[in-house]
Structures are given as structure tokens and as C-alpha cells.
Amino acid sequence: MSTENGTTDTTLAGTAEANTPFESKGKGKAAAESEDHPMGEAEDDEDDEDEDETEEPEAEEDNLEEIDPSNVISGPRTRQKEIDYAKAAQDLPAEEDDEEDDEEFVPEDEEMEE
């Protein structure tokens, strides 16, 4: 019940912690956890997953309506289709050359110094 400095601590009277001497934690050290977990028991919530399965399934999963054939896309679309990339590149607009703009760029700091 007495601490290392000789004073009596009455706040922990009658508990298991009152009978053990205090360890000096020091700077940056956390107090040890008092909860003990059995080795065979995992800390995960795996058991909670089994409980969720017994509940009602979501309404979205039960949507077993017939598929509308007008929404189904038939045909190979782009599969097994030869694509001429050279022709596709000609159809695209030409890209602007940005290298010229880079030469003209002067950061704000350098503009003020001049």
C-alpha cells in the first residue's frame, strides 16, 4: 500500500494492483495492459461473422428478376477485331508542342530579382 517514496496510496486499497509495487514508467512508456487474452482465443471478430449469416439477407441479393434481352449487347464489339492504330492516330487532332512554352517560363522569384 505504500509507494516507493514512502507515502500510502489509499486509492488502490483492496485491489490486486495495490499489492504490487509500482514500476517507474519513465518518459514515453505506456502502462502495461491488464487484460489477458487466452492463447486459444483470437482477438478478431471471427465469431461475429457467423452471427451475421443467420440474419436476413439483403434485399439487393434477392433481386432475381428476369434479365431484359434489350440490355444485352451481342456481337464481338472490339474483341477479335483488327485495329489499325496508324489510321486511328491520323484521325486524332495533332498535339501542341509544349516544349516551346517551357523555355519561356520564368518563376516568380526570378522575375522579382531582375
From Swiss-Prot:
Residues 1-114 are annotated as: Disordered. Signal peptide: none annotated. It comes from the Eukaryota. Residues 24-40 have a biased composition (Basic and acidic residues). Keywords: Chaperone, Nucleus. One of its GO terms (cellular component) is nucleus. Its main location: nucleus. It holds the Pfam family CHZ. Residues 41-68, 93-114 have a biased composition (Acidic residues). It is found in: Nucleus. Forms a heterotrimer with H2A.Z-H2B, stabilizing the association of the histone dimer. Also, with a lower affinity, forms a heterotrimer with H2A-H2B. Forms a chaperone-bound H2A.Z-H2B complex that acts as a source for SWR1 complex-dependent H2A to H2A.Z histone replacement in chromatin. This is Histone H2A.Z-specific chaperone chz-1.
